[in-house]
Amino acid sequence: MNRRSLLRGGGAALLAGFVPWQANAKTARTPVGYLRTNWSRDPYAFGSYSYIAKGARKRDHRRLASSIEDRIFFAGEAANSTRNSTVHAAYESGQRAAEELLAIDAQTVGIIGAGMSGLSAAHALAGNGRTVTVLEARDRIGGRIWTDSRLGPAFDLGASWIHGVIDNPLTDISNALDLVRIPTDDTYVVRGRDGRNIPDRDAPDWLDNVTEVQHSAGADSSQINTWAYWDYSDYGGVDVKFLNGYAEIFEALNGAYETLLNKSVNSISLQGTGVVVGSTDGASDMFDAVIVTLPLGVLKQGAVEFDPPLPNPKRRAIEQLGMGLLDKVYLQFDEVFWDPDITWIATPENDLPQGQFNEWLNFAKYIDEPVIMAFNGGPPAFDLAGLTDEEMISRALQTLDLAYPPG
C-alpha cells in the first residue's frame, strides 16, 4: 500500500468536538478523548483541497490564478498552475502572486485570507516595503493548517505532511526553524473481521480506491479527470510530519504586516485605480491591489461578490475544478490494543458502507502515545458529515472492535 500516490494531497479540518467519551452499552472500549474534523461544514473552507474533476483541465488552475486588471490577484493551492492540493503548492502560489504584484505600482496591498498562501505573500511583500493588511475571517491564522494540542500531543486537524522533502521550499523553511520532522513509512496491515490478517491478494478490489484515491484526492476515481494527472510531477523524497504540529512553520512568515482576525470579506470592487474590500461588519478598506487566497470551496459558494463580476474563464474554472474532502477522527485510549509497530492499518470488514473508517494511522509508533486516527475521504466523508459526534465515534469504535476483538 504505497502512500506516495499520484494524487496525494494535504488534509484539512473543522474541529467538531473534543470531550471525554461516554461509553454506552454497545461500546467495548472507551477512548479517553477524541478530535473530529468536518471540513465540508466549515464556512471558511467548504472542503479540504482541490482536484481536477472530470470536465476540468490543468489550464483551469492557470485561469484561476490569473489576475484581473493587474489589481486583483489570486493565490492558493488551487491557484497553482503546476501543482495543487498541498501546502507547498499554497506557499508557492503566494510567492508567485507577490512577485506579480511587486511588478506593478501598488504600495498598499490587502490580502484576503491568512492561510499559507496569504501569509507567504504577505511576508514577501512586506519584506519589499509594501504596506500589507491581511484580512482573515477566522479567529486564528493558518486556514486549513490547524494544530490542536488538547489531547496532549500536537495533532494536525488540517494539513499534516511535507509531501516530498527534496528541493521542497517547506524543507528549507523548517530547517531554518530547526523544526523536528518525523518520516512516516509505508508499513501496513489489512485487518479483517475477528482480527485476521488479510493478505494483499485477498483484499477487496475497492480498497485501493479508498486509500489511494479518496484519501489522496478527496474524491472518488469516478469524479477525477485522471488524464490530467498523467504528466503531473512534484517533489521527491520521503513524506514527513512535524512532531509539534504544522502550525509552527508560520513563525518563518512573520513580518511587518497587519493581520485583522474575525474580518469576513463579502465584496471586492474595482474603483478608480484601487480596490475596495467590504466586510460583513459594514467596514470597507481601499487598497492599491488585493490578493484573494480564498479556498476553492468558498469561491464556489459565491460568498464574496466581485464588481465587476469575475471573467467567464475564471468563473468556469471555479465551477469545473473539484473541491475534495478528507476528514479525520483522532481517538486516544489508555493503552494501545492495535498493531503497535505498523504505520497504516486498513479495516475493510467493518460492516459499514465502503469508504467509511477503512484506513487508520497509528500515532503510537511515532509519538509513544495511545492515539490512532481514521481517515474518511471523498463521497463517504460527505456522507458522514451530517452525523453527530456520538454517531461518528460509535462507527469508529465498531470498526476497531471488529479488527481487534476485545479480550
Predicted regions and their residues:
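FAD-dinucleotide binding site
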Residues: 1-407
